[in-house]
Curated annotation (Swiss-Prot):
Disulfide bonds: none annotated. This is ABC transporter B family member 3. It is a multi-pass membrane protein. Residues 180-479, 837-1157 form the ABC transmembrane type-1 domain. PROSITE patterns: ABC_TM1F, ABC_TRANSPORTER_1, ABC_TRANSPORTER_2. It holds the Pfam family ABC_membrane. The chain crosses the membrane at residues 185-205, 232-252, 303-323, 325-345, 410-430, 457-477, 838-858, 882-902, 968-988, 989-1009, 1060-1080, 1134-1154.
Length: 1432
């Protein structure tokens, strides 16, 4: 098969040819072959003929109707034609030789027997169609495999690339654009309002200019200041409206776009071809829709409006500065390149670090979803610690990246603050020089005044400070751009089989003619392992075709190709004469009905699960389909009937019930083509017979492909085809194949004799014996029984199904008051970072002291400007400039350490919370996961978002809040010291600010606490994890619509939150402007009335005979001037101290939405952490049994599932198993057999009764120790992403490679594993779809065997295996079972007839028990079940 793949690659891509090796002549290789691979009449050797370079047909040596060939070489090898068509050169021989070289490297080359009726025809196929036609289809075909260097280069490019900021808004609709436009206008005007205060303040400064008393002795300061205060009040009203609009409009626009992007991402994910999911983990994809989109929303919501606001402030400040005094402004802006360089570097590094961090978090989310979704397997094999460690390792990667991001974040903040305050030093020094030298202001055409300098300086202060305030927004934008990169990659990817596309043929009906022509195929995740190479198959309309053969031979791949889950790498598949790639994908799949071996149900009602097969189906149609699938009886007996919730992945239903619902889902589709992949494997005998009858009716007139290991289900097929290693080696009717006595004949013989305990006695195969017909006649010929008796049995079987089915959950309306988690508890969780806390707190103190210090220094500078003495101005201005330099250095250092340390604290908290939350989930009992609120989607959503949001209480945001609190306190201390009267009046307004902020936080917390994203996240998670079922039943649009419906609740709450947040923020800003207004008005009054003024000493020191004639008109004027100067100093010190306090309050309140989210998330997180486990598998408590014998006793058990307390599963169940014996449980589907195993493993506790092992009550045993006693092989094996070796080692965590291989040999999996290119290191990938059902089951058996368990639990452990594998695995299990207590659940009674005890379970009670012979003699239910099976 490898040869064929290489030939195809060479034919299609000559430019990628590998080194070519010539073999000049034909070679005859004689190779020894194992006995198992010999066919009848063969000796110990096989003849393999390799083709010469010039003979394309030498692969096949025809001997009449039978040819002998190597299945690993292509039957059609016409690559010379391919190469001539693709490239006019003479590389034909080289291509063939390259294939032959690969051929020689094969470990074994087996002889296959096949029908040669189309051999010559196949050899003459014109393969250039395969290369030329594919481009004509609307969806692509195969892609070249990338080299390692290309992959590395692509990874480097991904790291360096980032989504342009504006592209974040690519999904905005017209409404969003209008909202953003209006929000931008509001933000621009609102941002420009604050620098306007600088003009007002310049007027205030000039209003207090003392030299005015020389010109006008009657000048009244109070009247001037009162007029200025009125302007501020008007400005405050405008700011209130603008702040409301800015915040509300951007929040609404962000909420709308995020909802849309989530839908687009989900739709884009669902439209991808199935092969894409083989290389992209579904759990990471679904995790991204919860975690990455949160960062995306942060980057496009109100933070954008806030950034525009700050940027507008920056621009307006500098515009005012240039207008009032371009010389001074130009000096200040000369340092702006430093800010630009620092900002660019910081943003670039933050973007890269964010992307790496999100990738690590996505991997962690994938681990969480995989393990939570497979919690029963995790619990069985005590894999909780492995899961936690794997999850933690990914979190550690994200944490390490977070540390680096924290460093660059702190560095950026510190650098910006240093440059800004350093610029102030330069500005004041230069401004004082302009005043002292009496330089003419070219704008006002008069000498520079203190008011001019203050207006320019204050405008630039506000503008420059806004850059620092915008820095957190830039960090969020960087995170959003990094998160959007992966999201947009999925959205922009063109699917090769797009179910949403309207292109292609949309057939009204199909006759069902199917033809595979020279098909070559390999799975995208395993390009080196060809499945088909030149595969040919033709099916006539209305035919029923049975596919049989070894596991892994390619049977299920045929179905996948027909469904267009994958496209062939070469060749074509024709449907009614048209290549299926020309059909519309959705239209094609709507005409095909599929029932898989492992049915996938969704966490909704039974009715909705069946309706997935036909959109808009009526209830009558649903019930009719259920009747045909033998599901109506058990459904109608459930308390909620068709409205019963099946639970996540159908966990509330038994295996047989799930399968019957899945069959009903296919039946209601009324397809033209029916694909049945082991569709009755999970059913008991009665159900199998009845469902098979229903399927027989359904198959009439339809083309049907049936994959079956149970040959009785395909005995009447029109054609039966034996598939071996991707080649159809035998075909014909049942009678024709039996007459030929070939591989199919062997398979029938093996299956007819298959028993568990006589396999050891019959170690050698009985081939073509003379007594064969007599032995298999009951299996092959007695296919019809009385329908009336079977209907009666069905009624009895289904009568009690309701005990193992789901009851609709009672919905509780919880209108609880929003809980709160004490801040101290969150901080306590960061206790290990006490040292970082101390340094971070000191840094916040330093940063918080900067602004009060600035108020003091700035006030001194204003006082200097008011003094008309130029010598005084020059001397003191230099000192004040040096004080600004000191402030700049301190601010740079404190901001760096504050930003860095608090971010590190936040990263550590996020890591610890996520790890502990996941550990808390892993320690819960299995019954806890049955609850709707604990579904996989909801839990992974909480893990992805809540822990990260809690960081808002302790990380950088908390640092900023602490900083601003200290700023406020420092400012108030200065204000009270400078003028308590004015301070008290202003402080009287503060309760309004505090109350507004508190109300905002409480209301936002109320909205945030509502679990709005959970249901939508659950829909997405289930759809992506069950993508094959979604694709097969073309329910992609339904899923998207359901997701959209689930989004309505969170979206409406988000809009409410936007209005409240906008109003609260606007009202807070209004209060601040009122404070400014009151400060100037009342301050002017205090100065004018003399309350604020100079002391007698200050007057006497400044009003001397030397200064009066030089500066003042007279002594009275000098006295008034000194009172004005010192009064102005007190007033401005109070004012700027209050301004700094107000800035602290304003910035703290701006983080109210984040803090509210953090507090709500903390409630969710700590509620999970505090949830006790009824059955904790991680605790060390409990007894341990030193020497385990294996005696088991179930004593008077009564049990009902936690989600269905009214439906009793067990009613006095009692059973005793002696050590070393085998006990088989048989009976109706849903009767409680699997529940027995669940209770034994303590997935649940019985309501009444006890279970004993060797006399020990299992409730008293350590849970982990208890589960280590068992080896479980379930009906539907669950494997994990990772290598095959990792999955087998999951049974014994410290297993060596030798132990792994030994377990694989015992489970008959070693041979197919070593045939894979990477052997035991083969990555299974997401959902391990590249393995057949039998291969998965054998790996699962190896996983159980490697534990060397004391007690073996087998739940239909061989139901998915073919006859050959079943025999070998049964032999392996027989060896393992020796000396062990074994419980076997089986529908096939042949596998348990030699059990020491057989118990018939019905409705949660054992109605009869005994050996096989004893139960047959009793002629009870077991006897009837046995004879029913023998008559099939």
């Amino acid at each position: 098969m490898d040869d064929g793949n290489e030939n195809n690659e060479n034919a299609q891509h000559d430019e990628y040819d590998e080194e070519e090796i010539e073999i000049p002549i034909d070679e005859i290789i004689i190779e020894e072959v194992d006995d198992d691979h010999l066919l009848e009449g063969e000796g110990e050797f096989q003849i393999i003929t390799q083709p010469s370079n010039n003979n394309n047909n030498s692969n096949n040596n025809n001997f009449g109707d039978i040819y002998v060939s190597n299945p690993n070489t292509p039957r059609n090898n016409n690559n010379n034609n391919n190469n001539n068509n693709n490239n006019n050169n003479n590389n034909n021989n080289n291509n063939n030789n390259n294939s032959n070289n690969s051929f020689n490297n094969n470990k074994k080359n087996e002889v296959s027997i096949g029908i040669s009726e189309n051999t010559n025809e196949n050899n003459n196929k014109n393969n250039n169609n395969n290369n030329n036609n594919n481009d004509d289809y609307n969806d692509g075909a195969d892609e070249r495999v990338k080299t390692e260097e290309e992959i590395k280069k692509e990874a480097e490019n991904e790291l360096n690339q980032s989504v342009p900021f504006l592209s974040l808004f690519r999904f905005a609709d017209n409404t969003d654009k209008v909202l953003m436009f209006l929000g931008t206008i509001a933000a621009v005007i609102n941002g420009a309002a604050m620098p306007t205060v600088s003009l007002v303040f310049g007027l205030v400064v000039d209003a207090f200019k003392p030299t005015q008393f020389n010109d006008d002795p009657n000048y009244d300061i109070y009247d001037t200041v009162r007029s200025i205060s009125f302007y501020l009040l008007m400005l405050g009203g405008g700011v209130f409206v603008l702040s409301y609009l800015e915040t509300t409009l951007w929040m609404i626009a962000g909420e709308r776009q995020t909802s849309r992007i989530r839908r687009e991402y989900l739709e884009s994910t669902l439209r991808q071809e199935i092969g894409w999911f083989d290389t992209n983990k579904a759990n990471e994809l679904s995790s991204r829709i919860n975690s990455d989109t949160v960062l995306f929303e942060e980057a496009i919501g109100e933070k954008v409006g806030r950034f525009i606001h700050f940027f507008s402030t920056f621009v307006a400040g500098f515009v005012i500065g240039f207008t009032k005094g371009w010389q001074l402004t130009l000096v200040i802006t000369s340092v702006s390149p430093l800010l630009a360089i620092g900002g660019f570097f910081t943003a670039k590094m933050m973007t890269q670090m964010t992307k790496l961090g999100q990738e690590a978090y996505s991997r962690a989310g994938g681990v969480a979803e995989e393990n939570i979704g497979s919690i029963r397997t995790v619990a069985t094999f005590s894999g909780e610690k492995l899961a936690i460690d794997k999850y933690s390792n990914n979190l550690k990667d994200a944490r390490t990246v977070g540390y680096k991001r924290s460093f660059f974040n702190g560095l950026g903040l510190g650098f910006v603050q240093f440059v800004i305050l350093g610029t102030y030093a330069l500005a004041f020094w230069y401004g004082s020089t302009l005043i002292s030298n009496k330089v003419t202001n070219s704008v006002s055409d008069r000498p520079w005044t203190g008011g001019d300098v203050v207006s320019v300086f204050f405008a630039v202060i506000i503008g420059a400070t806004s850059i620092g305030q915008a820095s957190p927004c830039l960090a969020l934008f960087a995170q959003g751009r990094g998160a959007a990169y992966k999201i947009f990659q999925v959205i922009d990817r063109q699917s090769k089989a797009n179910p949403f596309s309207t292109r292609g043929i949309k057939p009204e009906t199909l006759s069902g003619e199917i033809e595979f022509k020279d098909v070559g195929f390999h799975y995208p995740s395993r390009p080196d392992v060809p499945i088909f190479n030149g595969f040919n198959l033709k099916i006539k309309p209305g035919q029923t075709v049975g596919l049989v053969g070894d596991s892994g031979g390619g049977k299920s791949t045929i179905i996948s190709l027909l469904e267009r889950f994958y496209d062939p790498c070469q060749g074509e598949i024709l449907l009614d004469g048209e290549d299926i790639r020309k059909f519309n994908v959705r239209g094609l799949r709507q005409k095909i009905g599929l029932v898989n071996q492992e049915p996938v149900l969704f966490a909704t009602t039974i009715s909705e699960n069946i309706r997935y097969g036909k959109e808009g189906a009526t209830q009558d149609e649903i019930e009719e389909a259920a009747k045909l699938a033998n599901a109506h009886s058990f459904i109608s007996q459930l308390p909620q009937g068709y409205n019963t919730l099946v639970g996540e992945k159908g966990v509330q239903m038994s295996g047989g019930q799930r399968q019957r619902i899945a069959i009903a889902r296919a039946v209601i589709k009324n397809p033209n083509i029916l694909l049945l992949d082991e569709s009755t494997s999970a059913l008991d005998a009665e159900s199998t017979k009845l469902v098979q009858e229903a399927l027989d009716v359904l198959m009439k007139g339809r083309t049907t492909i049936v994959i079956a290991h149970n040959l009785s289900t395909i005995r009447n097929a029109d054609v039966i085809i034996y598939i071996k290693k991707g080649v159809a080696v035998e075909r014909g009717t049942h009678d024709e194949l039996m007459a030929k006595q070939g591989l199919y004949f062997d398979l029938v013989e093996k299956q007819s004799h298959q028993q568990m305990y006589n396999l050891l006695e019959n170690g050698t195969r009985s081939r073509r014996s003379s007594t064969f017909s007599a032995e298999v006649n009951p299996l092959l010929d007695s296919f019809h029984v009385s329908k009336r008796s079977l209907r009666k049995n069905e009624s009895e079987s289904n009568k009690k199904d309701k005990e193992d089915s789901n009851n609709k959950k009672k919905k509780k309306s919880n209108k609880k008051k929003v809980e709160e988690v004490p801040m101290s508890r969150v901080v306590k969780y960061n206790r290990p970072e006490l040292g970082l806390w101390c340094f971070g707190f000191l840094s916040a103190v330093g940063t918080g002291a900067v602004y009060p210090g600035f108020a003091m220094v700035f006030t001194e500078m204003l006082t200097i400007f008011q003094n008309p003495d130029p010598n005084y101005l020059t001397d003191h201005a230099n000192f004040v400039a040096l004080m600004f330099v000191a402030l700049a250095v301190g601010a740079g250092i404190s901001n760096f350490f504050q930003g860095f340390l608090f971010s590190v604290i936040g990263e550590k908290l996020t890591y610890r919370l996520r790890r502990d939350c996941f550990a808390a989930i892993m320690r819960q009992d299995v019954g806890w996961f049955d609850l709707p609120e604990n579904s996989t989607g909801k839990l992974t959503s909480h893990l992805a978002t809540d822990a990260a949001l809690v960081q808002g209480m302790t990380s950088q945001r908390l640092g900023i809040v602490l900083q601003n609190i200290l700023t406020m306190v420092g400012g108030l201390v200065i204000a009270f010291y400078s003028g308590w009267q004015l301070t008290l009046v202003i402080i009287a307004c503060f309760p309004l600010v505090v109350i507004t902020s508190k109300v905002q936080m409480q209301i936002l917390a109320g909205f945030s606490s509502k679990d709005g994203c959970g249901p939508a996240g659950q829909v997405a998670s289930e759809a992506i994890s069950g993508i094959r079922t979604v694709a097969s039943f073309t329910t992609e649009k339904q899923v998207v619509e359901l997701y959209k419906k689930q989004q309505k609740g969170p979206s409406s709450e988000g809009i409410k939150k936007a209005h409240i947040s906008g109003f609260a923020f606007g009202f807070t800003q209004l209060i601040l402007f009122c404070v400014y207004c009151l400060s100037f008005w009342y301050g002017g009054k205090l100065v004018g009335s003399g309350v604020f003024g100079a002391t007698d000493k200050e007057i006497s020191d400044n009003c001397t005979p030397q200064t009066i004639p030089y500066l003042w008109k007279d002594y009275d004027t000098c006295e008034r001037a000194q009172n004005t100067i010192y009064g102005f100093n007190s007033m401005t010190r109070v004012f700027f101290a209050i301004v700094m306090s107000a800035i602290g309050v304003g910035q703290a309140s701006s983080f109210a939405p984040d803090l509210a989210k953090a507090k709500a998330a903390a409630v969710s997180v700590f509620k999970l952490l505090d949830t006790p486990s009824k059955i904790d598998p991680t605790t060390e408590d409990g007894d341990r049994i030193d020497i385990v014998g294996g005696d088991i006793e179930f004593k008077n058990l009564h049990f009902s599932y936690p989600t269905r307390p009214d439906n009793s599963v067990f009613r006095g169940f009692t059973l005793t198993l002696q050590s070393g014996t085998t006990t088989a449980l048989v009976g109706d589907s849903g009767g409680g057999k699997s529940t027995c195993l669940s209770l034994l493993q303590r997935f649940y506790n019985p309501v009444v009764g006890e279970i004993f092992i060797d006399g020990h009550n299992i409730k008293n045993l350590n849970v982990r120790h208890l589960r280590h006693l068992f080896g479980l092989v379930g009906q539907e094996p669950t494997l994990f992403s990772g290598t095959i070796a990792d999955n087998i080692r999951y049974g014994k965590h410290d297993a060596t490679q030798e132990e792994i291989e030994e377990a694989s040999k015992l489970s008959n999996s070693h041979s197919f594993i070593i045939d894979l290119p990477n052997g035991y290191n083969t990555e299974l990938g997401e959902k391990y779809t590249q393995l057949s059902g039998g291969q998965k089951q054998r790996i699962a058996i190896a996983r159980a065997i490697i534990r060397n368990p004391k007690i073996l639990l087998l739940d239909e452990s061989t139901s998915a295996l073919d006859a050959d594998s079943t025999k070998l695995v049964q032999e392996a299990l027989e060896n393992v079972m020796k000396g062990r207590t074994t419980i076997v659940i089986a529908h096939n009674l042949l596998t348990i007839q030699n059990a020491d005890c057989i118990a018939y379970v019905r409705a949660g009670q054992i109605i009869e028990r005994g050996t096989h012979d004893e139960l047959l003699e009793a002629e009870g239910p077991y006897s009837q079940l046995w004879y029913n099976q023998q008559q099939k």
